[in-house]
């Protein structure tokens, strides 16, 4: 019998899941959005209830000084767990709407925790939770998520120690527009950063968070972040001809912060596997990898249909739509690849993931998608002279 009654209703006024940024909709009040992945709700860790933006999965606060302490930093307080605060696109400075920003960051982080849990990023896999119950892994490692962090601008980052130590996200303000913009309000940036935690915990196992620190593997770390951010923002009206940017709202630039848009069109985005030969920066390499995964997602949507429900529908552990299936296969691949993998090894890990999950039902679809940008059967890794293959 539990000492704490975990089941307390909560409400968050935020940009809902699937809305990437303020250009896509308006804040709405969302009640009790957690899933079974958060049995204590988002505002309890099973031992204590918190009338603020703290719980089992995350602790969200502002951090204007950019310092490393967080526990005594400012958070909105709401004894009735109604986190409803004003925001307007003309409000300035961002600190004037810090309650809204912290709530939004808390919501997006928790919502992504719950989605990834459904795909298998759970306690035993090394996820970010204080209280793991008796479900394996190491606890005491929620995500420390800082809104309006003063240690930088026009960027964001996520630090991932091994399982059992908290991850730390720093979200910055962007000085690219007047008034300045708060990166917390662009869900894709939050998702990109949290995905560093996912990939670093899965690749090489949760006890080793140093398996994505080579140039090519570090590039894929950036690419996975862009891929999940983009897959989550897809809309029902989208088709394989829909192009997406990364970071466009925060950067105040329709092209976003990458060299090319994410597009299945090789004229719009000409990146190929051999493009990596001339790239020396992880975000550039990541854009190549995410472009391949964007192609893969649309190939699986064409094969299985696309659903735009917030949560996947599973049958025998398999997401029943191509969008969520791509997210599941890509995530499973992270855990199957070697430490510091290259593109060829990561591709093979996704094929292995499909074999384990569906008995290779999508083998041809996956090969064809990767071959499109030169990561086909004959592709070979060499740090200075990669060989492409369209077959």
Swiss-Prot record:
Q: Where in the cell is it found?
A: Secreted
The residues of the propeptide are 1-9
Q: What is its EC number?
A: 3.4.24.-
Q: Name one Pfam family in it.
A: Peptidase_M36
In terms of CDD domains, this protein maps to: M36
Please provide the record's keywords in A-Z order: Glycoprotein, Hydrolase, Metal-binding, Metalloprotease, Protease, Secreted, Virulence, Zinc, Zymogen
Q: Does the keyword Thylakoid apply?
A: no
Q: Which GO terms describe its molecular function?
A: metalloendopeptidase activity; zinc ion binding
Q: How is the cofactor bound?
A: Binds 1 zinc ion per subunit.
Mention any one GO cellular component term assigned to this protein in its UniProt record.
Answer: extracellular region
Q: Which residues are glycosylated?
A: 173, 243, 385
Primary subcellular site in the record, as a coarse category:
secreted
Cross-referenced Gene3D superfamilies, in alphabetical order? 3.10.170.10, Neutral Protease Domain 2
Please give the InterPro entries that the UniProt record associates with this protein: Fungal_virulence_M36, Peptidase_M36, Peptidase_M4/M1_CTD_sf
Name the domain of life: Eukaryota
An example GO BP is: proteolysis
Tell me the residue numbers annotated for binding Zn(2+).
192, 196
Cofactor(s) this protein cannot do without: Zn(2+)
List the active-site residues: 193
Family that this chain belongs to: Belongs to the peptidase M36 family.
Function recorded in the entry: Secreted metalloproteinase probably acting as a virulence factor.
- Write the protein's name: Extracellular metalloproteinase 3
> Which taxonomic lineage does the organism of this UniProt entry have?
Eukaryota, Fungi, Dikarya, Ascomycota, Pezizomycotina
């Amino acid at each position: 019998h539990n000492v704490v009654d975990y089941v307390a209703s909560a409400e968050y006024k935020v940009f809902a899941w699937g809305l990437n940024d303020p250009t896509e909709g308006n804040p709405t009040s969302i009640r009790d959005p957690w899933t079974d992945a958060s049995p204590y709700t988002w505002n309890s860790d099973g031992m204590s209830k918190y009338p603020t933006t703290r719980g089992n999965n995350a602790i969200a606060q502002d951090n204007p000084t950019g310092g490393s302490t967080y526990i005594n930093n400012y958070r909105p307080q709401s004894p009735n767990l109604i986190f409803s605060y004003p925001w307007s696109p003309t409000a300035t400075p961002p600190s004037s709407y810090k309650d809204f920003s912290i709530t939004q960051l808390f919501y997006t982080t928790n919502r992504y925790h719950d989605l990834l849990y459904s795909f298998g990023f759970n306690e035993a896999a090394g996820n970010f939770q204080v209280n793991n119950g008796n479900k394996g892994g190491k606890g005491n490692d929620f995500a420390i998520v800082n809104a309006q962090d003063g240690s930088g601008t026009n960027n964001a980052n996520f630090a991932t120690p091994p399982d059992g130590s908290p991850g730390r996200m720093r979200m910055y303000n962007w000085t690219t527009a007047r008034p300045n913009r708060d990166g917390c309000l662009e869900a894709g940036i939050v998702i990109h950063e949290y995905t560093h935690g996912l990939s670093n915990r899965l690749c090489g196992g949760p006890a080793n968070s140093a398996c994505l620190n080579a140039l090519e593997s570090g590039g894929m770390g950036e690419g996975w972040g862009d891929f999940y951010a983009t897959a989550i923002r897809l809309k029902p009206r989208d088709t394989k001809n829909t192009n997406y940017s990364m970071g466009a709202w925060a950067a105040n630039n329709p092209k976003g912060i990458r060299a090319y848009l994410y597009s299945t069109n090789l004229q719009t985005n000409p990146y190929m596997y051999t493009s990596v030969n001339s790239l020396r920066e992880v975000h550039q390499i990541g854009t190549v990898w995410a472009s391949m995964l964007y192609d893969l997602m649309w190939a699986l949507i064409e094969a299985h249909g696309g659903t735009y429900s917030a949560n996947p529908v599973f049958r025998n552990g398999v997401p029943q739509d191509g969008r969520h299936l791509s997210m599941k296969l890509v995530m499973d691949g992270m855990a199957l690849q070697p430490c510091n993998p290259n593109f060829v090894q990561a591709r093979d890990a996704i094929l292995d993931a499909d074999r384990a999950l569906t008995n290779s039902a999508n083998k041809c679809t996956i090969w064809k998608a990767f071959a499109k940008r030169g990561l086909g059967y004959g592709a070979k890794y060499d740090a200075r002279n990669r060989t492409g293959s369209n077959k």
